[in-house]
Regions:
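Positively charged n-region of N-terminal signal peptides that target proteins for export
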Residues: 1-5
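Bacterial N-terminal signal peptides
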Residues: 8-19
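Residue-level detector of transmembrane insertion/anchoring sites
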Residues: 16, 42-44, 203
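Boundary at the C-terminal end of the N-terminal hydrophobic targeting segment
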Residues: 21-25
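Alpha-helical substrate-recognition element adjacent to the catalytic core
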Residues: 26-34, 38-170, 184
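C-terminal cap/substrate-recognition subdomain and adjoining C-terminal extension
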Residues: 33, 129, 133-281
Length: 281
């Protein structure tokens, strides 16, 4: 009888533990913003909402994206096989400095309106490099400007004000930092960088909502949240997979990449037509 009772109690405890674990953390795949909007209805000042940037908030327009079309990706990889990492940074800086950007989903404006109206703490978390990058003097300022231009200002939403340089995490791709409510990891693991920001500021929310297009980033933050006993909602955002692939002209693209490699210029189609009139004939 005692053994039976003990086993029953153990099973009850195990069930309770599993239930608690399930409620503390979950990751779901979403293709639109409706699940995020629903989560925000239950959020308050004790929630931290974290947004990835590329392919979640913004992305380059079709003419300027470098990796969404297989042929462009192939041309880029061919150049990469010939050049050093530093030379590639230079070319990437040239190309990205001319890029035009678009929203992934215009409905994000309503999400940010809700965050501002209800004063829900929010930050951006991006793995982008920092510091000088090719002809871009400070990549962090370049990134923040694009966000501001498209309506994403985290300065009044971030719970951690000011600028924070994380020199202890510094590697070859720049210094991880917090600036204007944007955490830039310089290719350091997102969870590791976020943990440093939270520790330095002694700020620990009760709940984290994180939206990212890369599953491993979500899993990394899920583990961190578990360690910190923070409830976690991960949203694996796949909206870009439903956006039609850019329509390109392979002949034009090949010349475009040749000019990029040899002359360090990234031309749009109109500029290419002016440079090489025969392309439009």
């Amino acid at each position: 009888m005692i053994r039976t009772a003990t086993l029953t109690i153990f099973h009850l405890f195990l069930s309770f533990f599993v239930a608690i674990s399930t409620t503390l953390a979950d990751i779901i795949e979403i293709s639109d913003l409706a699940p995020l909007a629903e989560l925000l209805k239950e959020s308050d000042k004790d929630t931290l909402v974290i947004f990835d940037v590329d392919h979640v908030l913004i992305m380059p327009t079709d003419e300027h994206t470098l990796n969404r079309h297989p042929y462009r990706k192939q041309l880029w990889q061919e150049i990469e096989s010939r050049l050093s990492k530093e030379d590639m940074k230079t070319l990437y800086g040239v190309a990205t400095s001319k890029a035009k950007w678009r929203l992934i989903d215009p409905g994000i404006a309503d999400i940010f309106g809700h965050l501002r109206a209800h004063k829900i703490p929010s930050v951006a978390l991006t793995s982008i490099y920092t510091g000088k990058f090719g002809n871009i003097e400070r990549l962090e300022d370049w990134r923040i400007k694009h966000l501001h231009d498209l309506g994403f200002d985290f300065c009044n939403l971030t719970p951690v004000k000011g600028e924070m340089l994380l020199h202890e995490l510094e590697e070859q791709d720049g210094t991880p930092m917090l600036k204007s409510g944007v955490i830039l990891t310089a290719q350091v693991d997102k969870a590791k960088t976020l943990a440093c920001v939270l520790s330095r500021s002694n700020y620990y929310p009760k709940t984290i909502i994180f939206i990212d297009d890369i599953l491993s980033n979500l899993e990394s933050l899920e583990r961190l949240s578990s360690e910190l006993k923070i409830k976690f909602h991960g949203l694996h955002y796949t909206a870009t997979s439903g956006i039609p692939m850019p329509v390109i002209n392979e002949k034009i693209e090949k010349i475009r990449f040749q000019i990029l490699e040899k002359e360090h210029e990234w031309l749009d189609y109109q500029e290419l037509a002016a440079r090489v009139p025969a392309l439009t004939e």
